[in-house]
Amino acid sequence: MVHLIVQLSKYIMIILFLIYTFLCFHLFKYPDKPKKQKHIYNLQRFYMFLIHLDGFLVLFVTTMDTKIIGFYIAQLVLFESIYLIYHKFYKNASELVLNNMVMMLCISMMILTRISFDKALRQFVFVLAGTIFAFLIPLIMQKGTMFRKLTWTYAGVGILGLLSVLVVGVASRGAKLSLTFGPVSIQPSEFVKILFVFFIASMLYKSTDLKQLAITSGVSAVFVLILVASNDLGGALLYFFTYLVMIYVATKKFYIFAGGLAFVGLGMYAGYHLFSHVKNRIVAWLDPLSVIDKAGYQVCQSLFAIGTGGLFGFGLGQGLPNKIPIVSKDFIIAAISEEMGGIFAVCLIMVCVSCFLMIFNLSMQMKDAFYKYVALGLGSVYALQVLLTVGGSTKFIPMTGVTLPLVSYGGSSLLSTMIIFGMIQGMYIMQASPEKRRKIDDKRRKDHETKNRQKQTAKEPGAQGSQQRRRKPAAGGKNSTKTQK
């Protein structure tokens, strides 16, 4: 009977998630029909909570652990509270971004509860903390006016944060990633990436001339080199490609992007010959079976899990996800694919794609250049993180140690991603608010007038001299007229 319930539930879950994913993209068909959009958002929430219920029902049936029921109810209360508060205070927030955030949190809670109830419980505590940030940040962004002026504060705090890990950080799997304070471990690079985006956005907002680009590139290189020195190659790639995308969009010069890609290729070639851990990862990527007992073990187990799970998976609780090293973090997509099915995993990736499209669309709509660059940078961080995680788990690219946002286990990753989503919502609210748009337009006009006055002031000595030279003959003419009279 239990086996029948598990098998039936996995097909129901896949069908529900297929419908949810279809609705994510079907929404783009109705950009100017708010009633139709609202109906689709409500349908999404309905299917989302059915998936959540289905997953925890299976987990309870397979374990008969009553703690799972209480845990499910606590999650349900939290997720409903998120909707109630957002609808109460942030009426102009993006419903799709909100739905997708909660959907991915639901999936995270299901798969982490399956892997380890203790880890799921700890992750839930971080979700509670992240929810507070997600509520406060849109309000702060609406009230704050100093974000574009803190350029060197972003750079200084970010570099110090990364240097602290390099100097006193705790090494994990050959890389220095975190700072430990008693039982609490923090990964600063997860938060510094937000400061990194704000630094580049504020620099590009001021100017995109050669001097400004050179300074931006130099400081960005410091961020990346510190990560390389810490052996955090995934973080270094994430930061570098984010920088590359933002610079390319700001300058619209393709040779910069092409040069950046060539630089990455040269860096990988040099790293292969200089660093053993880089060589091991590349060998494990090219031929994992040849080093299955060593560097290739993780990738092989991930591929075995994805392959044996097939399109429909074994069902929650029926696979062997704990055979995959670091399954709750780097290889979470392999565990999802094994038990929930390849179709479910692809749907999850497409939900991530819809999030990026919404963020990119927001960037295109923002009239304020600073926030346009911020939205683009945060969207790039999110998309690249998904690409690096999924690509590493499927042998598309070498493993980088990057986690899947909102789904993988890890407090720092979860909090930073919820902060990013809170910022995206804040920009959606700013963009949708007529009053805020008017203030931004007024500020942009005043800034433009100030720049024009500064240019006129720079030319003023020459202008005054010419005016005086013009006035002298006129003055002489008047005096001569008086004399003649």
Labelled PLM ranges:
Residues 65-294, 334, 338-392, 419, ...:
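Hydrophobic alpha-helical transmembrane segments of multi-pass inner membrane proteins, especially
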Residues 42-48:
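Select subsegments of transmembrane alpha-helices in polytopic membrane proteins
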Residues 22-41:
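Membrane-interface helix-loop junction between the first two transmembrane segments
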Residues 2-3, 57-63, 116:
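Transmembrane helix-loop junctions at the membrane interface of multipass transporters and ion channels
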Residues 288-329, 333, 343-344:
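TM-adjacent membrane-interface loops and short helices in multi-pass inner/ER membrane proteins
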Residues 389-485:
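A juxtamembrane structural motif centered on a specific transmembrane helix
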Residues 232-237, 312-316, 326-329, 397-400, ...:
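Transmembrane helix boundary and interhelical junction motifs in multipass membrane proteins
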